[in-house]
Amino acid sequence: MISSFIDHEDFFHHFQPIYDLKEGYIVGYEVLLRSKKFANPELAFNSAIKEKKLYELDSRSIHKALKTYHSAGFTRKEGILFVNVFPSTLLNPKFPSFITIIMKEKLLTNQDIVFEISEKETNYDLNHLKKVLKQLKKVGISYAIDDYGIS
């Protein structure tokens, strides 16, 4: 079921505004995956994990979200795009070429996106992740820890 869900991109995204409450303006948008097949997006990701398709779902979701954002005419002046990503996606050997493709498609500039690293996944090589994050930072892509401190 999850393979078909991914292959047909049977999901869409909401872009939740993130406000600077002190200054009263939108600083960016958090990308939220939604679907009619999964009432809760966590169920889709859990299914992808179970079927070893997490990278496929994560990368397809990121790509579709960026295409949607870009085709809607949003630019840097509307704010930064905050995109949730699993550590295993960042560590996947296909991820660097995925980023290159996105950059070539001009779906983002390196300052347009912040990868929010999910804490829901805990079984990964932290040293390897640090190296990947350094590489992202070298090309100007920012990152943050998603839901830091929530257990």
Task: Go through the PLM ranges and name each one.
Residues 36-39, 62, 66, 147:
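Short acidic-capped amphipathic helix/loop micro-motif used as an active-site/signal-coupling element
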Residues 55-128:
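Catalytic core of bacterial c-di-GMP phosphodiesterases, primarily the EAL and HD-GYP domains
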Residues 44, 48-58:
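Short, solvent-exposed cationic patches
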Residues 18, 86-88, 118-120, 141, ...:
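Active-site beta-loop-alpha junctions enriched in small/polar residues
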Residues 1-47:
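Active-site core of bacterial EAL-family cyclic-dinucleotide phosphodiesterase domains
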Residues 132-146:
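Short beta-strand/loop segments at the ligand-binding rim of alpha/beta enzyme cores
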